């Protein structure tokens, strides 16, 4: 039996927000794909105008590729011939319809909407331009509508209409009842799904659908519209072989492709850039981009790397083949532009292709050398969403660094146990710090930031005006010499390494000012992918926001360079769970605008809005 969604290329496109809680009891509901389900409220969109989503909607529903039409036409005509030969094919539509424009001359997409959706469109935008508008209503007549559109009264009439029209694709654009009927009748090939990361009152909701019948095949970059983050998913029908890339190949395709980009970067091969998903011509649904949006061509060396990794024919490939039997990732995306996949792709690459090594802790690791991640702080706050992170602990530790503190008890008294294992008597004795008091961590990060070169005695002494205050110098340079190439903060003091409970992992960062914006690049020599790196991404992103504010700048980018990147053997099973999860849109970070001195920030000055996340994943720290 033919799949009509594929024959007639019927898609759904929608934008959904989080639903504002209506009672105290609903505030702590766990997050899930159904978190984003709000479609409308009182006859209009729940949110105010979201320009990014509107551009995306317009781009998706107006884009056509003339070169592919003949193939689509042949497919539809073949179906109609087969239908006719079987005695079917009643092509008489029951609807009373009209249409504006000569469909035969210009290839366009069809947009199908219910009456309420049609009436919610502002008058100046009716009918939606450069699209064949179809309104589904049992009560609307052509006398009720001044604009020239098709009016039909059932989904069956829509199928009859599509048999007659010359069109590229058909998009169901709302409302909830139309979505529900098309999904229940298996008439949707793909769902273009915008996740608006804000909570609003809603009275209309996107219908539930069988997620075993659809899988996520694309996750876009994270964008920001007037302070609200959003991203774009594509759900593809399982086994449909659709444009978004649902295929019957390996279920590890998604992360393998991301890992290939990570591997290419480790091998000094430039990774392909991703065009923003502003329409179906982007990588968001697998079609070739027009020239100005197309990613740059790969180098011969990169093509070789990609080919070898895909075919599993290299030395690493043979290792991957056997490992794949263990790694049963459910994610089947081909096109993953969400920034969190940089992190997930590195983990996947290390698990599949890493070198097995012993390590200081005795646990053992798989490791690789040299990765890079970039995060756009002007759009979002990169707090990982595939597991819940201890944000309060991240902020308290950063403030502790900024104050130049080395007393682990300060954090423990706030129930922040990040450094607890490194301050025990046993750990300090193993470091030959027999004279050191428990939880005296020595001249670690904060001491080097604020007192570089000073003689360290113990955690109780006063070091005011001793050593070099690197943080103060960094802020001074940003304010007074913003083009300086010496705006560097370094925690790696060779003379003090033996006195530290733990030598610094993130050892150096540099700041860059351009066009009123501040970027930070950080080099991390030792990178615990399971536990440490998620904290480091968030911490240095917050740090960049703080320094930008006190210097009257806007945050731009955080760039994370990873040296020895490793996965502990006792973290692998937990990380497999994390790799199965689809990221949510990142949250946003707001600082108290009244704070102008870096030392004046307190925990109450930080607000994280719309942090949607998966459940916590427990991993034991290797100390």
From Swiss-Prot:
Record-level GO cellular component terms: cytosol; mitochondrion
Region of interest called Disordered, as start-end residue ranges on this chain: 263-309
InterPro entries, alphabetized: DHFR-like_dom_sf, DHFR-TS, DHFR_CS, DHFR_dom, Thymidate_synth/dCMP_Mease, Thymidate_synth/dCMP_Mease_dom, Thymidate_synth/dCMP_Mease_sf, Thymidylate_synthase
Domain called DHFR: residue spans: 9-237
Residues holding NADP(+): 15, 38-44, 115-117, 137-139, 153, 174-181
Catalysed reactions, as listed in the record: (6S)-5,6,7,8-tetrahydrofolate + NADP(+) = 7,8-dihydrofolate + NADPH + H(+); dUMP + (6R)-5,10-methylene-5,6,7,8-tetrahydrofolate = 7,8-dihydrofolate + dTMP
Residues that bind dUMP: 360, 506, 524-528, 536, 566-568
Family: In the N-terminal section; belongs to the dihydrofolate reductase family. In the C-terminal section; belongs to the thymidylate synthase family.
Protein name per Swiss-Prot or TrEMBL: Bifunctional dihydrofolate reductase-thymidylate synthase
Source organism (scientific name): Plasmodium vivax
